C-alpha cells in the first residue's frame, strides 16, 4: 500500500480526527446486534491512545436523511466502545458534529481520552461532500485518520472532503483492507481463484471484467450463474434470470477464453417447485431443469468441483453466496465454499472474503477466524475488485 499510515506520525499531544465505520446493526430496542465494526477499529484507536494522542471519532449510522433522528444516535456505540476499550481513561460523547459545541468538547480532551462526535449524517452537508462542513470538521483535529474502509468508496465530507484541510493518513483497518485486496489483485500468489455469487450478473459485470485479466479460474454461483447458463442455451425453468444480460454473459465467456482464464459454471443444481424452505426439491444436472422449477443452490457435483479448485489455490477471493442461503435447504453450497476456503487457509493460501452476504455466511458457519481476511466493506470491496480508485483512499497522503 503506497499511502502514509498512523505509524508515520508523531502523535504526542496531537488531536487525531478519526473517521471510523460504526454503522452497526441495531434491533428494535436500539441495542447493537453485531459489534464487529466497532472491534475492527480498536487496533487503530489503541495505537493512537498508546502514542499520546487525543482521539476524536466520527462515523455515520444508518440513513437519517440529513437531519437528527434519535433512532440513529451513536449513543449505543459509545456505551459499547467504553466496554471494549478499558485503556481509554474516558470515552465521551457530544451531541455536536461541528461548530462551537464540538470545538469546546475537543478543547477539554486530554491525551488518553476519546470523544465521539454525533452521527455525521445528521448534517445534510455530509453526503454532499460540502467543503464548508469538511473545513469545520478539520478544525477539530491536527491529523485526519481514515479507518473507515466501508465508506471509502463514497466521497463524503468526513471521508474525503476533510482530507483537503488536514494531513491525511490511513488507520490499520484501512491499511489491512488495501493490502489484502489490493495485493491479491496486483501481485497474487498463484493459482489465483475467485468465487463470484449473488443474484444478479448486472451487479458484478465490472468485477468479473476486471478479474478476467488477473485470475486463473473464476467460479460462478448464485442467481447470476443462471444467466450464464441461459447464455449457453439451457432451459432454466422458472429460475431468476436476466435475459437482457445474456449478451454480456456471452461476451464475458468469450473474454475468459481469450485471456486464458477458466470460467466455471455449475454442472448440477438444487431446484425447488417454489421459493420456500418447505418447497419440494431435487438435484438435477443443469441440462435437465424442468419447467415450473427454479434453481436455488449449486448441487453436490458442483460443490465438489468448486471446493477442489479452492483447496488447490494459493489466493482466493470470494464475493457473493452460491444460493438462497437464508433458506436452510438451499444453504449447503454457500456453506461448502466457506468450508473449502477454511481448508485452503489451513494449507497456507491467502483467503479473502468480501461482501455482505459472504461475510454473514462465513460468520454463521463459525469460520471467520479461519480466513486470512474478512472484509468490512461491501460496496467498497466491490469497487476495489472492479479496479476503481476509492475517493477516501485517493485523498490520503502518498508514502514517501
Curated annotation (Swiss-Prot):
Keywords in alphabetical order: ATP-binding, Cytoplasm, Glycolysis, Kinase, Nucleotide-binding, Transferase
Catalytic reactions on record: (2R)-3-phosphoglycerate + ATP = (2R)-3-phospho-glyceroyl phosphate + ADP
EC code(s) of this entry: 2.7.2.3
Annotated GO biological process: gluconeogenesis; glycolytic process
InterPro entries reported in the protein's UniProt record: Phosphoglycerate_kinase (IPR001576), Phosphoglycerate_kinase_N (IPR015824), Phosphoglycerate_kinase_sf (IPR036043)
Protein name: Phosphoglycerate kinase
GO molecular function, one term: ATP binding
Highest taxon of source: Bacteria
Subcellular location: Cytoplasm
GO cellular component, one term: cytosol
Quaternary data: Monomer.
Gene of this entry: pgk
PANTHER family according to UniProt: PHOSPHOGLYCERATE KINASE (PTHR11406), PHOSPHOGLYCERATE KINASE 1, CHLOROPLASTIC-RELATED (PTHR11406:SF23)
Record organism: Chloroflexus aggregans (strain MD-66 / DSM 9485)
Family to which this protein belongs: Belongs to the phosphoglycerate kinase family.
Amino acid at each position: 500500500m503506497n499511502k502514509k499510515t498512523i505509524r508515520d506520525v508523531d502523535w504526542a499531544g496531537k488531536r487525531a480526527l478519526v473517521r471510523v465505520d460504526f454503522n452497526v446493526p441495531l434491533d428494535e430496542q436500539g441495542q447493537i446486534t453485531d459489534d464487529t465494526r466497532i472491534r475492527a477499529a480498536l487496533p487503530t484507536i489503541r495505537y493512537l491512545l498508546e502514542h499520546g494522542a487525543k482521539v476524536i471519532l466520527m462515523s455515520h449510522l444508518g440513513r437519517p436523511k440529513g437531519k437528527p433522528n434519535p433512532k440513529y444516535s451513536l449513543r449505543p456505540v459509545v456505551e459499547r466502545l467504553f466496554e471494549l476499550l478499558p485503556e481509554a481513561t474516558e470515552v465521551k460523547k457530544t451531541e455536536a458534529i461541528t461548530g462551537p459545541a464540538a470545538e469546546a468538547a475537543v478543547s477539554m480532551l486530554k491525551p488518553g481520552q476519546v470523544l465521539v462526535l454525533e452521527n455525521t449524517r445528521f448534517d445534510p452537508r455530509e453526503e454532499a461532500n460540502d467543503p464548508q462542513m469538511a473545513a469545520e470538521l478539520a478544525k477539530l483535529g491536527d491529523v485526519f485518520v481514515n479507518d473507515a474502509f466501508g465508506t471509502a468508496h463514497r466521497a463524503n465530507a468526513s471521508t474525503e472532503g476533510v482530507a483537503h484541510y488536514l494531513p491525511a493518513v490511513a488507520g490499520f483497518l484501512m491499511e489491512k483492507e488495501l493490502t489484502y485486496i489490493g495485493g491479491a489483485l496486483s501481485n497474487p500468489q498463484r493459482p489465483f481463484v475467485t468465487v463470484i455469487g449473488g443474484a444478479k450478473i448486472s451487479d458484478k459485470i465490472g468485477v468479473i471484467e476486471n478479474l478476467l485479466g488477473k485470475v486463473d479460474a473464476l467460479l460462478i454461483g448464485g442467481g447470476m450463474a443462471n444467466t450464464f447458463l441461459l447464455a449457453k442455451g439451457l432451459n432454466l425453468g422458472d429460475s431468476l434470470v436476466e435475459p437482457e444480460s445474456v449478451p454480456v454473459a456471452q461476451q464475458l465467456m468469450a473474454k475468459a477464453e481469450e485471456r486464458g482464464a477458466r470460467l466455471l459454471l455449475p454442472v448440477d443444481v438444487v431446484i425447488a417447485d417454489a421459493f420456500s424452505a418447505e418447497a419440494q426439491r431435487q438435484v438435477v444436472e443443469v441440462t435437465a431443469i424442468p419447467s415450473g422449477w427454479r434453481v436455488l443452490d449449486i448441487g453436490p457435483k458442483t460443490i465438489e468441483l468448486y471446493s477442489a479448485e479452492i483447496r488447490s489455490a494459493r489466493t482466493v477471493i470470494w464475493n457473493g453466496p452460491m444460493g438462497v442461503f437464508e433458506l436452510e435447504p438451499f444453504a449447503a453450497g454457500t456453506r461448502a465454499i466457506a468450508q473449502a476456503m477454511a481448508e485452503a487457509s489451513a494449507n497456507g493460501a491467502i483467503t479473502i472474503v468480501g461482501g455482505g452476504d459472504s461475510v454473514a455466511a462465513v460468520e454463521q458457519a463459525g469460520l471467520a477466524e479461519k480466513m486470512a481476511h474478512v472484509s468490512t466493506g461491501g460496496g467498497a470491496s466491490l469497487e476495489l475488485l472492479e479496479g476503481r480508485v476509492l475517493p477516501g483512499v485517493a485523498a490520503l497522503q502518498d508514502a514517501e
